[in-house]
């Protein structure tokens, strides 16, 4: 989940329900770049994701945010800069998940 911490926790609600998908891991997309907006070196990015237990051995990885824009940024980091083979963007992202009544949510 690449959204901000308040969105992930369910305090910044941008759909009919707030929170996050159960079992999701939060790594905010802005952590991929330095203060000038440039991508961090690959070694730093690898360390960032490894510290959140996100490795290429994890299995299928789906990035999401509110509308898949920030998620695509993190997808690029994982798939292109770090070379993960198992990454996809959840296109519906939180707009879809958070507005459905039949999806589980943690906060």
Where are these regions (language model features)?
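Rhodanese-like catalytic fold shared by cysteine-dependent sulfurtransferases
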Residues: 2-107
């Amino acid at each position: 989940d690449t959204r901000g911490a308040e969105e992930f926790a369910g305090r910044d609600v941008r759909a009919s329900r707030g929170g996050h998908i159960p079992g999701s891991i939060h790594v905010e997309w802005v952590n991929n770049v330095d203060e000038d907006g440039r991508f961090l070196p690959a070694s730093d990015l690898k360390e960032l994701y490894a510290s959140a237990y996100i490795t290429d051995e994890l299995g299928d990885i789906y990035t999401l945010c509110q509308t898949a824009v920030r998620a695509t940024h993190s997808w690029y980091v994982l798939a292109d800069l770090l070379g993960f083979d198992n990454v996809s963007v959840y296109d519906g992202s939180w707009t879809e998940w958070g507005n459905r009544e039949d999806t589980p949510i943690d906060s």
